[in-house]
Swiss-Prot record:
<dbReference type="GO" id="GO:0005509">
    <property type="term" value="F:calcium ion binding"/>
</dbReference>
<dbReference type="GO" id="GO:0031267">
    <property type="term" value="F:small GTPase binding"/>
</dbReference>
<dbReference type="GO" id="GO:0055038">
    <property type="term" value="C:recycling endosome membrane"/>
</dbReference>
<feature type="region of interest" description="Disordered">
    <location>
        <begin position="203"/>
        <end position="243"/>
    </location>
</feature>
<feature type="binding site">
    <location>
        <position position="62"/>
    </location>
    <ligand>
        <name>Ca(2+) 2</name>
    </ligand>
</feature>
<comment type="subunit">
    <text>Homodimer. Forms a complex with Rab11 (rab11a or rab11b) and arf6.</text>
</comment>
<dbReference type="Pfam" id="PF13499">
    <property type="entry name" value="EF-hand_7"/>
</dbReference>
<keyword id="KW-0479">Metal-binding</keyword>
<keyword id="KW-0968">Cytoplasmic vesicle</keyword>
<dbReference type="InterPro" id="IPR019018">
    <property type="entry name" value="Rab-bd_FIP-RBD"/>
</dbReference>
<protein>
    <recommendedName>
        <fullName>Rab11 family-interacting protein 4A</fullName>
    </recommendedName>
</protein>
<feature type="domain" description="EF-hand 2">
    <location>
        <begin position="47"/>
        <end position="82"/>
    </location>
</feature>
<feature type="coiled-coil region">
    <location>
        <begin position="348"/>
        <end position="556"/>
    </location>
</feature>
<feature type="compositionally biased region" description="Low complexity">
    <location>
        <begin position="151"/>
        <end position="161"/>
    </location>
</feature>
<feature type="domain" description="EF-hand 1">
    <location>
        <begin position="14"/>
        <end position="49"/>
    </location>
</feature>
<feature type="domain" description="FIP-RBD">
    <location>
        <begin position="558"/>
        <end position="620"/>
    </location>
</feature>
<feature type="compositionally biased region" description="Basic and acidic residues">
    <location>
        <begin position="162"/>
        <end position="172"/>
    </location>
</feature>
Amino acid sequence: MDGNVFPDQEQLLAFLKKLKEVFDVCDEDADGYIRVEHFVDLGLQFGQGDEVKKFAKYLDPNAHGRINFKDFCHGVFAIKGCEEILKSALGTPTIAAQPYQTDNGYYYQHQEGSLGPPIIVCTRPYPECQLYSDEEGMGGRDMQESDMDSAADSGAGSESSEGGRQDDKEEGLGGFFLRGNNCGQMVSSAAASVISVEEQFEDYGEGEDVDFTPSSPIPDDDTRTNGFSDLGSSLPSSAGQTPQKIRHLYNSELLDVYCSQCCKKVNLLNDLEARLKNLKANSPNRKISSTAFGRQLFHHSNFSSSQGSTEDLFRDSIDSCDVDITEKVSYLEKKISELENDSLANGDLKSKLKQENTQLVHRVHELEEQIKDQETRAEQCLEEELKRHREAYSKMERDKSTEIELLSNRVQQLEEENAEMKVNVCRLKSQTEKLDQEKQRMTDKLEDTSLRLKDEMDLYRKMMDKLWQNRHEFQKEREAMQELIEDLRRELEHLQLFKLETEKPGRGRTAAGLSEYNAKTREIELEHEVKRLKQENHKLRDQNDDLNGQILSLSLYEAKNLFACHTKAQSLAAEIDNASRDELVDALKEQEEINFRLRQYMDKIILAILDHNPSILEIKH
């Protein structure tokens, strides 16, 4: 932005359209107003409470409780610090109306509440001056605009379409807030604000002044073209407008009056400006351009003319126009003479600078010779340093080759030792594998022996149970035999008594009784023999039990020893990876001794089984 003028009306129009979309989203009832409570509720979803309340105060300064679109736009521009842009574009009456005067005697005037375009009044009462106002209708204005279009047809034809587009943009901006006749007021106010801001002159260096070339040799056209060329050259280019665009803005409905007599003085000013340009182009130290200087004079006259009221300016304009132009011409002639004197002084300065330049050239030549001498000495020193570095480098190469040879010999020796260690490791690995296999085989044998021992223990337990049963049966048989013997003894006594009784009455049955007595005696002897045999059997059984107990105790003792050796073998197997070769050999010998003892124990068990119960070794299906 430049000042208070938005650089592009299309951008302002697009921004207002976006604000309208936001306004429609917040307008929940679609009645053209936003309730402040609803707006605060929406704002609390995206910001803090204090900031939302301050924003609502900006949008509703009068605390009406609702916000229309105009207040919404003014609040947004006020928060962004750009409220003056909206006011200037919409013709808001914030600044008092002030007249503006140009060098050719025109006054630009826009007042508050004016419904038509601003009026330009000529200060010189010539009969060629024609005044048109809004009360006379559009007839005179159409004639005047046709004259201006014919004068600027060849040089500014393309800018006329841009002026039309600008008017359309301004009408679009006004249409956001006003309807009907108010739109015309907004357009005229916006155009007047553009003119008022464009007359704020700034110096941006030299620029090109583009003059119109008339398409026909009519005197009025020439004077009009020059007059508009002066207007275009006296406006700044910093606001994004070229002189042709500004002239087209003046050719639009902002210019209602044109004075051909006033342009004669303008032609004189243009000649003086041309002389100033030539002097400035030839001057070695240019400070300010002629166009910028003319702008400063125009701004000074504009500022001085804006101090009085509109009525005083109209009253004094006729008397002061000639005096002001004469003073300006004299002032410009004085400045031209001063610039010519400055040009002469600059010529003397130029000759002096040439002499100093000659002296400096000689000094440069001397310094170049000194530099050549220094370069020669530097090359000699460089050659000496290179020679010294080559010698040092050759010595380092020799030392390096010797060290590399020693290191290669050491590496070869280490490789041989490494190969020997690899062979030893392979051999030890093979021995370790063999020992592991032997250990596994002995472990399997020990497991088999343990299983067989378990079977023998089960068999012994069964035999003991069977022996106990036999003893119990024998005891029962013995008791039954004793009872039988007692019965036989009682029967024998009874028979003896019967025999005695029978002998007493007669001796006829003596032979039969004797034979019966002998049978009884033989029976008693047999009973005694059975009793004796049973006692011997009982003794043999006791001896068998004692022998079986001894065998069992011996087997348990041997099993304990074998289990202890097996545990030791397991611990040895756990340490076999960290043991040395001698330790492995000792462990192997100890394992072989354990295996030999285990074989002897197995042989003893087999012999004992063959002696006492060979049926155990029989294979049963």
